[in-house]
């Protein structure tokens, strides 16, 4: 099979979990600096800004996420049918930028917040440890270990030697 057929098969016959992961959008520069992540899975209630296509520069809240097509419906973006009825326009998740997060899901917010803080803590610890020249004592005396290992090896060698002589 050709590579394009294999790629299309992976995309269009993907599992529900894989499709859900494909509905991701990049974060705005402010959110990227705050959370330390580049992209996030879009959920209902997130505030997004369209960056490509006919509806470029329109902001709104996500009203519906369609994992089957990898698209999102945004409040305020609708089209009109011939009879006058209005329907939501689906926009690809990759064509929007997340400008505000729906904070109602505590697990999601904890997972997002967990990446930015340790990096900041690690930088402060590195700065504090630059002045230290002496490594911390681990409580194990390295000098005694080789001697003990050599003594144990010598004992076992001595124990084997008399056996050879007695034969």
From Swiss-Prot:
**Is-annotated flag, keyword rRNA-binding?**
yes
Q: GO molecular function terms here?
A: rRNA binding; structural constituent of ribosome
Among the Pfam families in the record, one is: Ribosomal_L26
Q: Where are the transmembrane segments?
A: none
Name the segments for region: Disordered.
1-27, 107-167
InterPro entries attached to this UniProt entry: Rib_uL2_dom2, Ribosomal_uL24_euk/arc, Ribosomal_uL24_KOW, Translation_prot_SH3-like_sf
Please, which domain of life does this record's source organism belong to? Archaea
Question: What ranges does the record list as Acidic residues composition bias?
Answer: 136-145
Give GO terms for biological process: translation
Q: What does this protein do?
A: One of two assembly initiator proteins, it binds directly to the 5'-end of the 23S rRNA, where it nucleates assembly of the 50S subunit.
- Quaternary arrangement and interactors, per the entry? Part of the 50S ribosomal subunit.
Name of protein: Large ribosomal subunit protein uL24
Corresponding gene? rpl24
């Amino acid at each position: 099979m050709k590579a394009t057929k294999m790629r299309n098969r992976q995309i269009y016959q993907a599992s529900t979990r894989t499709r859900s992961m494909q509905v991701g959008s990049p974060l705005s520069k402010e959110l990227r600096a705050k959370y330390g992540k580049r992209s996030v899975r879009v959920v209902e209630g997130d505030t997004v800004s369209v960056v490509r296509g006919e509806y470029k520069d329109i902001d709104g809240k996500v009203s519906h996420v369609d994992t089957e097509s990898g698209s999102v419906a945004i409040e305020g973006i609708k089209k009109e049918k011939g009879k006058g009825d209005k329907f939501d326009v689906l926009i690809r998740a990759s064509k929007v930028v997340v400008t505000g997060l729906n904070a109602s899901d505590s697990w999601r917010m904890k997972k997002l917040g967990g990446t930015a803080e340790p990096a900041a803590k690690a930088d402060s610890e590195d700065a504090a440890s630059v002045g230290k020249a002496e490594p911390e004592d681990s409580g194990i005396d390295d000098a005694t270990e080789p001697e003990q290992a050599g003594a144990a090896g010598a004992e076992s060698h001595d124990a084997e030697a008399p056996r050879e002589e007695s034969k």
